[in-house]
């Protein structure tokens, strides 16, 4: 029963899907929902796939993919790309650590954040459009899973830059190998039914490598990770996966 509660809480935390269930959880136990982030990715990928099937016969591929990317942000409340924008505003402000963290917390978008947001949206549309039509559904299903698993991986290898403040701070420094192992097994088990395991492992390995580099670089700059930088990790991991899918032929 506890695991079901954590799964529902993960869905509520990571999406804007209407789930009218109130769940009480101890703050000290909140980090355990990370194990189920890939299932959130499965649900998002499934919804995007159905959306693609519904639109593909009525619009050009470019227009369909524009709708897909836009809808993906509607499903998540744009929380990850907002984190990407805030991260770029902070990291490229040329300020000290405390000032960078303050800038990331500011709800206003700066030039660097706007550029990061625009480039991410454009690149996602571009690579989705250029993925082989035969594996488009595969890419739509798998990419959100990789993005969420990358968040879990990043939380496992870093600590909180804010000393445990914020929702990200409830998990950073607490998510360990157990949570990542569960998330990893869920991801592998799901992918087994969608594409060849060897292909998934290659794409996942590249995405996790990018996640490692990004997470360590950010940690070097601000002393750890935040909820915003975890959002950036998700976006960059998803973009990496899409780039890989462009070169895949199944």
Curated annotation (Swiss-Prot):
It catalyses: alpha-ribazole + adenosylcob(III)inamide-GDP = adenosylcob(III)alamin + GMP + H(+); alpha-ribazole 5'-phosphate + adenosylcob(III)inamide-GDP = adenosylcob(III)alamin 5'-phosphate + GMP + H(+). Pfam families: CobS. Its main location: membrane. The chain crosses the membrane at residues 33-53, 63-83, 109-129, 137-157, 180-200, 203-223. It is found in: Cell membrane. Its cofactor is Mg(2+). GO terms for cellular component: plasma membrane. It is an enzyme of class 2 (transferase). One of its GO terms (biological process) is cobalamin biosynthetic process. Keywords: Cell membrane, Cobalamin biosynthesis, Magnesium, Membrane, Transferase, Transmembrane, Transmembrane helix. Belongs to the CobS family. Joins adenosylcobinamide-GDP and alpha-ribazole to generate adenosylcobalamin (Ado-cobalamin). Also synthesizes adenosylcobalamin 5'-phosphate from adenosylcobinamide-GDP and alpha-ribazole 5'-phosphate. This is Adenosylcobinamide-GDP ribazoletransferase. It comes from Thermoanaerobacter sp. (strain X514). The lineage of its organism: Bacteria, Bacillati, Bacillota, Clostridia, Thermoanaerobacterales.
């Amino acid at each position: 029963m506890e695991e079901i509660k954590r799964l529902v809480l993960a869905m509520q935390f990571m999406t804007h899907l209407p789930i009218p269930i109130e769940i009480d959880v101890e703050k000290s136990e909140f980090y355990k929902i990370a194990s189920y982030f890939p299932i959130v990715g499965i649900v998002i990928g499934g919804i995007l796939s159905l959306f693609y099937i519904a639109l593909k016969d009525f619009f050009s591929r470019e227009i369909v993919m524009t709708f897909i990317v836009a809808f993906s942000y509607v499903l998540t409340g744009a929380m990850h790309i907002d984190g990407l924008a805030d991260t770029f505003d902070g990291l490229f402000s040329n300020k000290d650590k405390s000032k960078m963290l303050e800038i990331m917390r500011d709800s206003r978008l700066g030039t660097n954040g706007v550029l990061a947001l625009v480039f991410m949206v454009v690149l996602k549309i571009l690579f989705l459009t250029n993925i082989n039509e035969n594996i488009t559904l595969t890419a739509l299903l798998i990419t959100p899973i990789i993005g969420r698993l990358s968040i879990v991986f990043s939380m496992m290898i870093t600590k909180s830059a804010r000393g445990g403040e914020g929702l990200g701070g409830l998990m950073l420094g607490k998510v360990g190998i157990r949570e990542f192992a569960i998330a990893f097994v869920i991801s592998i088990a799901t992918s087994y039914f969608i594409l060849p395991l060897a292909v998934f492992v290659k794409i996942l390995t590249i995405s996790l490598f990018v996640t490692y580099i990004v997470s360590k670089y950010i940690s070097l700059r601000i002393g750890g990770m935040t909820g915003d930088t975890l959002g950036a990790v998700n976006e960059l991991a998803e973009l990496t996966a899409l780039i890989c899918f462009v070169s895949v032929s199944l």
